[in-house]
Amino acid sequence: MYIRRIIGFFLFCSIAFSAFAEMPYRTVLRKADDHFANREWQEAVAMYDVLLERRPGRVKTYVDAVVASAMMNDSSSIMQYVVRSEMQGLSLDSLFTGIDVLSRSIGQSGIYEQVLLLVKEQQPWFTRVTNNYLLGYYVFRHDAEKILAVADELLSVMPGQINYL
């Protein structure tokens, strides 16, 4: 009798786990969105990983995953998603714009700056690109000191651009 219960339990677990693995994409997406809305960041990131395995070319999923990772202050995870999006050939503009909009919508606009500074540090070949986005962010925040610092940095590599003066 005891052996039947153990076998039954293992059979139930194997069926349950296989059913979870075969969840429709929309169901997993809804669960990820629910976790994000409830600020359950680790669970949301786990769901976004599943979604990205199924559809790796969807920018919105990368945006959500980066913001959830930033809310956990996990810089390695943030960079993992940024690099994965680059490997998929997705536009950095779409990624950065999405992060900006989403972080503002949840009242955490500092996440956008955090991500830009991290990308600038980890991928120095994107310094000019990230500085342009940082300049726009600092103008939005009316942060004169940082505006001048970024503008000076941009002018040092592009002295002919008078719009940075």
Where is each model-derived feature located?
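Alpha-helical repeat scaffolds
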Residues: S76-M87, S109-Q122, E145-L155
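Short coil turns that delineate tetratricopeptide repeat
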Residues: P56, L90, P124-W125, P159-G160
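Residue-level signature for tetratricopeptide repeat
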Residues: D34, A68, V101-S105, G136-Y137
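Alpha-helical segment of the N-proximal tetratricopeptide repeat
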Residues: R26-V50, R54, V129-K146
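Bacterial N-terminal signal peptides
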Residues: G8-S18
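Canonical tetratricopeptide repeat
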Residues: D64, T97-G98, Y133
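Register position in tetratricopeptide repeats
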Residues: A37-N38, M71, R104-Q108, F140
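TPR alpha-solenoid repeat register
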Residues: T61, S94-L95, T130, N163-Y164
